[in-house]
Swiss-Prot record:
<keyword id="KW-0407">Ion channel</keyword>
<protein>
    <recommendedName>
        <fullName>Leucine-rich repeat-containing protein 52</fullName>
    </recommendedName>
</protein>
<feature type="repeat" description="LRR 2">
    <location>
        <begin position="78"/>
        <end position="99"/>
    </location>
</feature>
<feature type="disulfide bond">
    <location>
        <begin position="26"/>
        <end position="32"/>
    </location>
</feature>
<keyword id="KW-1003">Cell membrane</keyword>
<dbReference type="GO" id="GO:0005249">
    <property type="term" value="F:voltage-gated potassium channel activity"/>
</dbReference>
<dbReference type="GO" id="GO:0099104">
    <property type="term" value="F:potassium channel activator activity"/>
</dbReference>
<dbReference type="GO" id="GO:0008076">
    <property type="term" value="C:voltage-gated potassium channel complex"/>
</dbReference>
<dbReference type="InterPro" id="IPR000372">
    <property type="entry name" value="LRRNT"/>
</dbReference>
<feature type="glycosylation site" description="N-linked (GlcNAc...) asparagine">
    <location>
        <position position="148"/>
    </location>
</feature>
<dbReference type="Pfam" id="PF13855">
    <property type="entry name" value="LRR_8"/>
</dbReference>
<feature type="repeat" description="LRR 5">
    <location>
        <begin position="151"/>
        <end position="172"/>
    </location>
</feature>
<feature type="disulfide bond">
    <location>
        <begin position="30"/>
        <end position="39"/>
    </location>
</feature>
<comment type="subunit">
    <text>May interact with KCNU1; this interaction may be required for LRRC52 stability and may change the channel gating properties. Interacts with KCNMA1.</text>
</comment>
<feature type="disulfide bond">
    <location>
        <begin position="188"/>
        <end position="214"/>
    </location>
</feature>
<keyword id="KW-0433">Leucine-rich repeat</keyword>
<keyword id="KW-0325">Glycoprotein</keyword>
Length: 313
């Protein structure tokens, strides 16, 4: 699924125009050298302005930044390396990285991310390494979040709040070599089955295999998520527990009761129908007998009249 095809000419024209204004200054308290800007540990609360437009490597780690403005970040069209580790970023908006389509390395670990939309990384087709570990409030990922990051080789999802993951989320990552999934509260219930089977079928073995374990259900607590495929298949597809047997028993009883009632109603209807037909036949016979008797009396009356007529003459 292609969510975006890169920045259009309008964005590039806008970036060029802004570049004429911005110049090539260096942010206060930051170090700028050879297309590299280092603002590590400067207690910044906002994204720094005056970053040279030819910057290729930008270090914003160990600060207090809460957001990444797409308008300013998008001016760095040559940026290939962005480190935002250990800040206070809560969310990255749709198309936050629309102007940095050359980005190869992105570190958003140890922040306060709560959600990532399917469009956040939509233009980062060149991205090779992505780290979003240590975001404990990140509870879910959309199945198309990584749809366009087809060059990704390294993905770190450790220590987030992820409880399950749609198998489609990793389906497009055919070049992925390193995957970290440990430290997450994986709920290995029936909704987790598709992802567990996906890990087996596509040989998607996390680099921290033995540490990426289930926290639920009790039967699978501590099991590596790469090894719960078969147990889950048994529990969710082929295995019947006592609730299933009770359900089947109730279904059988309902079918039996419904059949019995239906048979009884059929019998009652048949008896009523036969009684109705019998009464109708008796009435028809009585009516026929009455007609015969009337006809006989009329015939006798006419015969008597014919016999008496000559005597009167």
């Amino acid at each position: 699924m292609s969510l975006a095809s890169g920045p259009g000419p309008g964005w590039l024209l806008f970036s060029f125009g802004m570049g004429l204004v911005s110049g090539s200054k260096c942010p206060n308290n930051c170090l700028c050298q050879a297309q590299e800007v280092i603002c590590t540990g400067k207690q910044l609360t906002e994204y720094p302005l005056d970053i040279p437009l030819n910057t290729r490597r930008l270090f914003l780690n160990e600060n207090r930044i809460t957001s990444l403005p797409a308008m300013h970040l998008g001016l760095l069209s040559d940026l290939v390396y962005l480190d935002c580790q250990n800040n206070r970023i809560r969310e990255v908006m749709d198309y936050t990285f629309i102007g940095v389509f050359k980005l190869i390395y992105l570190d958003l670990s140890s922040n306060n991310l709560t959600s990532i939309s399917p469009f956040t990384f939509s233009v980062l087709s060149n991205l090779v390494q992505l780290n979003i570990a240590n975001n404990p409030h990140l509870l879910s990922l959309h199945k198309f979040t990584f749809a366009n990051t087809t060059s990704l080789r390294y993905l770190d999802l450790r220590n987030t709040g992820l409880q399950t993951l749609d198998s489609a989320a990793l389906y497009h990552l055919t070049t992925l070599e390193t995957l970290f999934l440990s430290g997450n509260p994986w709920k290995c219930n029936c909704s987790f089955l598709d992802f567990a089977i996906f890990l087996i079928v596509f040989h998607m073995d996390p680099s921290d295999d033995l540490n990426a374990t289930c926290v639920e259900p009790t039967e699978l607590t501590g099991w590596p998520i790469t090894r719960v495929g078969n147990p889950l298949r048994y529990m969710c597809i082929t295995h019947l527990d006592h609730k299933d047997y009770i359900f089947l028993l109730l279904i059988g009883f309902c079918i039996f009761a419904a059949g019995t009632v239906a048979a009884w109603l059929t019998g009652v209807c048949a008896v009523l129908y036969q009684n109705t037909r019998h009464k109708s036949s008796e009435e028809d016979e009585d009516e026929a007998g009455t007609r015969v008797e009337v006809s006989r009396r009329i015939f006798q009356t006419q015969t008597s009249s014919v016999q008496e007529f000559p005597q009167l003459i």
